[in-house]
């Protein structure tokens, strides 16, 4: 579970993305959200990411943001609704390290 970067919907299918692989999962995002450890976080209606693998967050002019992960070209979009909670979660993690 630790090596999963994010889960993302693609049509009716949910994919688990690792650095170099993609796997299909049978669960819906809302089910994953309830089952996953606390270092995973919903960041849009179509994505849940692993906060342990965030390399950078870039805020766009449209108020949405893009998260990149170290060692891969993969990225996830964060809706403006989830941006502040994500930043708060990362700050909290940083303070408890």
Task: Describe each region flagged by the PLM.
Residues 1-78, 97:
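Conserved binding/recognition cores within well-folded domains
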Residues 77-81, 85:
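Short, charged alpha-helical segments
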Residues 85-97:
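Charged phosphate-binding loop/patch that engages nucleotide di/tri-phosphates or the phosphate backbone
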